[in-house]
Structures are given as structure tokens and as C-alpha cells.
């Protein structure tokens, strides 16, 4: 009789443990889904910049990344969008840069988080052999990932462009130019720890 009671208690403990694991797993999945679906969306102006113009051809590839190709290319830029920002929100900036001769590749990120695809830039520069000067950049979390990518592939880039961002990798001995742009009234970036 004691053996049966022991087995019942063991099964009960197992089922309670499995139920707790299931509830915690579902809660975690729900939290992740809510988190990645709460992001800054592109406005109408940004979406309009996804259209080709007289001087810029806009191409969307199979990865949903967007390339802005100017008629006369002077350099190339691979751009990582900021965390929880719809990547197409950067289309006006990319289109304007392309109007000024810079071929821009605006990378699509899963869940609007560059950290989920830090190597998203792989292979893009090689698709445009006519571009000799390449730069990589990004905004916020995207800038962190772009700088990290540049640190691993320094020979492929002339520099890194950081918009309200910073590098977690040491870029000082890699021969890369670094342009850092931030607002004096930035409420997120900790300017006292920035330099």
C-alpha cells in the first residue's frame, strides 16, 4: 500500500512540476511576443521614401532588406536599424543619402531587434563590386551591432557611423574612422558615460 501511495505522490509531483513549467513557458512566450510586437512604426513619410525616384532606385530583396541605389555611386553604407524600430522608418534618411551618391542597404531585422541577427550584413557588400568604399552604421542598438560587425570585419569597411549609439567593441586599433552623432537633449543615451 505504501508503494502505491509513494507512486501517486511521485506522479502528482511530476504533473505539478510539468504544469508549472508549461505555465512559465507560455508566460515567457507571451511576454516575448508582446515585447517584439510593441515597436515604433514607420510613418507615411517613411513609407513614401521606399518608392524609387528619378535619381534613386529602391530594391527590396528576398530578406526584406531595402537597397537604395543612386545613379552615380560614390560609396556604400550598410545600416542596422535601432531596437524596436521598424526598419523602414529609416527610409527617408537612406533615400536622402542615396540622392547624394551613397548606395544604402537598410537591413531588415527579426523582431525589429538587430541583436537577433548581428551578422545581417554578410554578403551585401560583395553584391556591388562597383562600390569600393564601404561604411557600416546603425542607430541605437543597431549601431552597437554594426560596430560589433565592423570589429570582426574591419578590412571590409572604411568607417563606422553611430547614430545615438556606441561601440561595445574596441575599434581604436582597427584603422576605422568613427563618426558618432547624438543629440544634446537625448533622454536615453547616458552622455556622461559616452566619451
Language-model segments: what does each one mean?
Residues 174, 180-182:
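Short beta-strand/loop motif that positions the catalytic acidic residue
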Residues 107-110, 161-169, 183-186:
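Active-site nucleophile loop of the alpha/beta-hydrolase fold
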Residues 94-114:
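Conserved alpha/beta-hydrolase
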Residues 15-33:
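Hydrophobic membrane-insertion alpha-helices, especially the h-region
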Residues 93, 189-195:
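Short alpha-helix in the alpha/beta-hydrolase fold that links the catalytic acid
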Residues 155-167, 176-177:
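A conserved short beta-strand
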Residues 74-82:
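Short beta-strand element of the alpha/beta-hydrolase
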Residues 137-146:
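Gly/Ala-rich beta-loop-alpha elbow adjacent to hydrolase catalytic centers
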